Amino acid sequence: MNRLGIFTNFWERNWNFDHIKYIKKASRLGFDILEFQAQPLLEMTLSHMDEIKKVAADENIELTYSLGLDPRYDVSSSDEKIRQGGILYLQRIVERMGYMNGKIISGVSYAGWGAPGYIVDDKSAMVERSLKSMREIIKTAEDYGVIYCVEAVNRFESCIINTAREALDYINQIDSRNIAV
């Protein structure tokens, strides 16, 4: 039987909320999976993460994570400082997910989320920088057993991956079993 999941953003607009409340709500409603924004993991204490992890296990809810990468951490950026900062930021998130026994992250995490403030006639350089970054990030995902999924989105969310074909081409250029669409 297919497992069913729901994203906390169905109920919440902010990322800073009572995660335990929604784990229990998802369980009560018959869901098997609850997806959170990944960024708040960086602000949580380990004891709070332990509490969330325990409640999820008690309620038989698998936690998955998603991310719309802040442009300040754009791993496709031509600014090397921003790109390197993005790599470290995403590696820290994957490490925290590993601590939470999280197995899947998805979303726009291969470039800054949102349409760039400029026209992109040729995105190949951005794609190459993103791929270069992802080859580093995916090593951390492999170390923590995390599947790193890329999401094809419309041109107003990213110019890097807009079609299923582009998503497949992207993951095929990363030598890892831990990257998916």
Region roles according to the model:
Residues 3, 24, 33-34, 128-181:
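Acidic/histidine-rich catalytic cores of soluble enzymes
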Residues 97-119, 144-154:
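Active-site groove signature of glycoside hydrolases
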Residues 1-102, 124, 135, 142, ...:
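N-terminal pre-domain/capping segments
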Residues 84-87, 120, 124-131, 161:
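Short, amphipathic alpha-helical segments
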